[in-house]
From Swiss-Prot:
The keyword NAD does not apply. The lineage of its organism: Bacteria, Pseudomonadati, Pseudomonadota, Betaproteobacteria, Burkholderiales. Its main location: membrane. One of its GO terms (biological process) is lipoprotein localization to outer membrane. One of its GO terms (cellular component) is cell outer membrane. It comes from the Bacteria. A lipid is attached at residue 21 (N-palmitoyl cysteine). This is Outer-membrane lipoprotein LolB. Gene3D superfamilies: Lipoprotein localisation LolA/LolB/LppX (2.50.20.10). Keywords: Cell outer membrane, Chaperone, Lipoprotein, Membrane, Palmitate, Protein transport, Signal, Transport. The keyword Protein transport applies.
Amino acid sequence: MNRSRRLALFCLGAPLLLQACASVAPSRSFDGDQAAASQQYTGRFSANYVRYGRDEGVQGSFRWEEQGRNVRLDLVSPLGQTLAVVTATPSGATLDLPNQPPRNAPEVDTLMEEALGFALPVAGMRDWLHGRATQGAPARTTRDEQGRLATLAQNGWTVRYVAWQDAAAQVPRRIDLARDAGSNPLSVRLVIDPRTP
């Protein structure tokens, strides 16, 4: 079934799906470090990838919450259904999908790739969302006229900072990420909502 036909069927059945929508398990608590400052980002995402030799795509909204070394990432469809909840802590990663038992692994990328067909680089995003390279990993960078990151190549990803928010804090507005992994290329666009005081 082609992508447009699946989308049309999904949209036609959306009212029924919303009524029968299963929720994902309640939020897992983070390991220790509860007193650490919390950072939150919300916005929209789109991902284009190849799965089983076919071009695929997904889009929706995201909520990123970071507390110390712990991260929770919620991916939500355009109709408000939870696609996935990812929790990453120093002790491991959990991926929660609707109507499925939680999946656990030492790191989240493999979990996402197997379950969703694409994996957001959660480890790198901890720094990239803040407009900086990850420390301790080799990186090639370029900067714009204001001294902010313009491009970053690190850990197999190319990160392009397309726009920055108009704020005193240097917070990206749009980030394009690309990974050329041979037969499994992946491109992701993140549009980050302005922060509210």
